[in-house]
């Protein structure tokens, strides 16, 4: 773990490195295998890196809450864990905490997000991670029947033995779909031969926040960027209580010969036969 620039911290796990900017919203700015970047490096707002919001979105709508998305986070490094803590938003009355650590044995970087209810009221909220990647020559896939994705017809997901696969395309409108997956979401960058996999809690029906979902894919208009989104369970928090939600990040080289081989690589990374 190193502090290469003011406010920016780098975690390294084998060939993989993750850069987090505590000075600007605790965002994950970079995720690399050796020197090959896998997440978006665009410069205009809300187009780069990986961030964290509270769900449902209807509670704050837009733009993202500055205390969670853009303002500085306090930093603590202790026993191999890098912890970043946000300010409290006056309207929502939550504090966000992000804890980063490496899992050398499984070659993963583990991110645990916490939402703390600092209000004097009982609240309901869900965690929500948003990771942006380039819209060029990639493949997005997860475990769910293609005909279960909603709204139907917005993106051309194809079914491959129960795996929904989407080759990003271009449209003159913003598009977003929802899915009930199986606790993982993957992105293949064909140009760089890299496979990004994020693993999280597998939700069941009724657990996501209203009008939200375990897995969401947002494609920005044109050929710009895509958001890989995952959400945890909609949770009741009493005053002073917190929820904790963990996402495990994996990144490996990949040159699969088929979709079956690609899915098998994911299962090997996650060490699951499911």
What would you call each of these model-derived segments?
Residues 1-3, 12, 57-106, 120-125, ...:
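Extended, loop-rich substrate-binding clefts of extracytoplasmic carbohydrate-active enzymes
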Residues 8-10, 30-32, 83-85, 114, ...:
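Residue-level detector of beta-strand face positions
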Residues 4-6, 14, 274:
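Sequence termini and other peripheral, non-core segments
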Residues 8-70:
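Acidic-aromatic substrate-binding/catalytic surfaces of carbohydrate-active enzymes
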Residues 251-274:
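Terminal connector regions
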Residues 96, 109-111, 243:
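Hydrophobic core residues within well-ordered beta-strands of beta-rich domains
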Residues 9, 16-18, 23-29, 37, ...:
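A contiguous, surface-exposed recognition patch within enzymatic or periplasmic domains that forms
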């Amino acid at each position: 773990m190193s502090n290469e620039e003011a406010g920016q911290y780098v975690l390294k796990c084998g060939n993989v490195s993750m850069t987090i900017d505590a000075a600007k919203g605790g965002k994950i700015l970079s995720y690399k295998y050796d020197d090959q970047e896998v997440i978006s490096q665009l410069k205009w707002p809300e187009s780069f890196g990986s961030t964290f919001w509270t769900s449902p979105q209807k509670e704050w709508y837009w733009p993202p809450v500055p205390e969670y998305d853009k303002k500085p986070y306090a930093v603590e490094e202790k026993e191999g864990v890098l912890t970043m803590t946000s300010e409290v938003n006056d309207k929502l009355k939550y504090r966000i905490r992000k804890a980063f650590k490496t899992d050398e044995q499984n070659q993963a970087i583990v991110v645990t997000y916490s939402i703390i209810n600092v209000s004097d009221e009982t609240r309901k909220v869900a965690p929500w991670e948003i990771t942006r990647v380039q819209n060029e020559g990639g493949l997005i896939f997860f475990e769910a029947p293609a005909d279960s994705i909603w709204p139907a017809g917005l993106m051309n997901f194809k079914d491959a033995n129960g795996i929904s696969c989407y080759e990003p395309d271009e449209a003159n409108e913003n598009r977003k779909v929802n899915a009930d997956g199986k606790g993982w979401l993957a992105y293949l960058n064909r140009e760089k031969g890299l496979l990004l996999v994020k693993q999280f809690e597998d939700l069941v029906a009724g657990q996501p926040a209203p009008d939200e979902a375990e897995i969401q894919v947002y494609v920005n208009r044109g050929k710009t960027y895509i958001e890989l989104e995952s959400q945890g369970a909609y949770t009741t928090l009493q005053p002073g209580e917190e929820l904790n939600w963990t996402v495990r990040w994996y990144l490996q080289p990949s040159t699969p010969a088929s979709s079956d081989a690609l899915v098998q690589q994911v299962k090997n990374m996650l060490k699951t036969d499911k």
